[in-house]
């Protein structure tokens, strides 16, 4: 099978080679490494053709035993008729409207339908990854459905030929995990995976499946194609253009349509910004891409990846491209920011897949950069180093930069082992050639892979979707490097830039270091004549005009000066043999005079020009500064006036709107009160009528006289019932008089801020509302905290009800009492409480059992008590409220909720537990229960508060002992009469005092021992 594929590839090579001209072969030899052809290669190709024909003949002449293709083909039509009868597919003989079409649903459970497996095995059209190596036959667990191009003569697909979305996802997982990440390299499996993923997309299209499963599969397929564009760009059998077209028109276009359709049904795709950015990069130089991006939703358009792609698109625009029918149009006034483009690609903001897509545009951007550099550089400059070109355009090697330049006809020379390019306006540049082949970029693209596998890239690991930093992606402060390493010396101000005489003078002047020495040793330059200048000699020399140089309009002559001028006395020596016609002194005097006069005039003119330019610049600067200052003041005054008027209008409008809103709110409240009163009256009369009708229906027909009196009594009775019901409801929701209850606490020495804690453990909102009404609680700024306060006898009493204990202040407060609402106990829970055998059973309880809910309520109570014990200063009595339709077994309640353990635990701050069972409306009067609860208020400290006080006392005690020890040592060092034994005794006294204080923590003992320590210190001071 592999041999047949290789033969087909060789045929494709030869067919492509026949179409090439001699010029193309020559260009290909420059672009790539030339291949040597020989007679042996031709013989090999002929042998492969013969072998391919033999394999084709064997393939169609032999059949496998056990192949069911003929059997399945005979049953094909019957299966189609059954599918049409069952309404699974449309009948091709009966045309329908589009809205009446049958929704096609695939039923194939395997990665490849059975009919296709048998058919391709029969036709010997299997790939080696689909064949079981042990049996040599097709394997249903390895074969994947191939892509079938739709044509007019093809038969209609059956439901058994199409895979549903779960099977399609399974097939894609197999291709990624087993084929792409398998032992074979990516270039060998690309044709297989590309065909099978295309078949997956075809099955989604046949079923019109556009849900999240289809989106996820298309996203993974798109990532695979983007990965191949980079990884296989230099492979011979790979076509990057076809891959990009398949990605752009077949996958990304479908994904964009999926995103738009799902957004209409309020479904958000998390990876939409990522693939919108890929779509922008595939149309990098399309001027319409910005307009299409602006119609995206604001959250997609503002995403950092989309903004980064738009930034790259803006930097990739060119204005020097050759105009053609299929070529992208040039962008007017484009600055050709190619260096910023490559630096942004190299930054961490660009992900690996974005760099893979951008790699296909590198050569086009580099071509435009080369044309811009050629247009800007002059022929007088030296050749441009290939190393600098490699650095600016981010080639991997210098040889790549040289090959790229040779491809477009630029001359590349070797200067002492360093390659350089003749890059200027006069250099030849072949602009008609297509873009240079795509190169595998190691520095810009492959370095971003970061040791990740292909599966991580295709499946969209977090490394590939990192949040982009805004400062990195959209910063305009990208440092710009010079197009060459060293700058040429700038021309001296006052001279023309393009005149050769001026450049010569500037070069000659640059050789002088320091001041010009007129008294330097005399020499005879080679360019000077051996006799004095004459008028004819001077007139034959073309003078150089200084631009705006002299005020009198005269021309200044600049003699040529050699670069060999130096002040080294040893190198330049006067001529010993003086010529007789001209003396050495006269010649040197004339030369020095000419040089000094010329240079002095040049320097004077330069200084004058510099001074004039400096004065002009400073004048403009002062004028511009003064103008900006005046303009700024006028502008600020105007802005201030405008802002003041706007703010005044805004304030007036806001006041009017606030008053109008208050009036509207009052009107709405009045209307609500009227509506409530009206509804209450209507409800009252409706209940009254229903009661009257019910009573009237139970009375037999009597004479008219007795019926009249009977109706009157019924009305009175109904009115009494309604009044009694109203009184019962009022008593039920009547708030508790907390003032009278708190007044009984005056006999206790409680803290000034005393808190009554209410906690609702039930999930019923009605119970929570009832508790708020009974205790007159109001919601605070916190949404989960209700509070009310009372100021009695210079004490502040608070009633707090949080949703959770974590909503309470985390500082320790005085919670004097607590009301804990357990909630409603149904019949199953009461039976569970009464059943002692079940209570003591060690078996695990299921989560849906009533006992598990009861255990959960007991654990919740224990957790609540533990948290409150840490937050309260004093111990507190606890009132538990149970709701039930009958009396409870208190013994079972006590055992299940472990009241004894709650009271006797060392960490618990519960002083007593009281239980209130509400079975009817009369039990809802909480005044008696609260009075009993408040009568059991205690001032005893909680265990955690006691520990905190002991810790404070211990630290204070240690500080006093340490201070006393320091005092004793200080006195001992200052008193010579104290012996070592006395000092040791004085030092041991605080230690013994500390030990005794540790044993006895009573306050009286502590005071006595501290007093003894003070007396000891007084004795020491007296002795001193």
From Swiss-Prot:
The modification Phosphoserine is found at residue 841. Residues 11-21 have a biased composition (Basic residues). Residues 945-1022 form a coiled coil. Residues 39-52 have a biased composition (Acidic residues). Its main location: cytoplasm. GO terms for biological process: mRNA export from nucleus; protein export from nucleus; ribosomal small subunit biogenesis. Residues 22-38 have a biased composition (Basic and acidic residues). It is found in: Cytoplasm; Nucleus envelope. Keywords: Coiled coil, Cytoplasm, Nucleus, Phosphoprotein. The keyword Mitochondrion does not apply. PANTHER family: 80 KDA MCM3-ASSOCIATED PROTEIN, SAC3 FAMILY PROTEIN 1. This is SAC3 family protein 1.
